[in-house]
């Protein structure tokens, strides 16, 4: 209700990234921003078939809004594209029929991976990661001075039994 009240009070747009809605690990129910009463014209929901079904690079998703002005602006941008991802569209269409059991198995696997990752990270001296409540990634605090350089070092120089780790600096995802 707090978000809805702020959106209403200041007449803001609420961009709601709901691509990981199947991956909420707290037991809390998923509540879409589209169900917030009184701000229907302010909500812009972002969804992605490619993320839901682990189809990295397919880039097929949706932007959903009841706001006609926003919809028209988005359509102008979309119509300027010269080549929609036809193969990606075909893959995404087939993915929609994925059995519910598969999604449950994927959910269980992500919970297991999350628990393993967080447990391992938090055992390293100087490293801390909160337990993510959703999705399948974490933002960990590491004892390094420069996250960009550390991530590059992991890819170019780190080796453990012939393997490495790919990380991304959180600065690329957040402004705070």
Predicted segments, located by residue:
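PLP-dependent class I/II
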Residues: 1-176
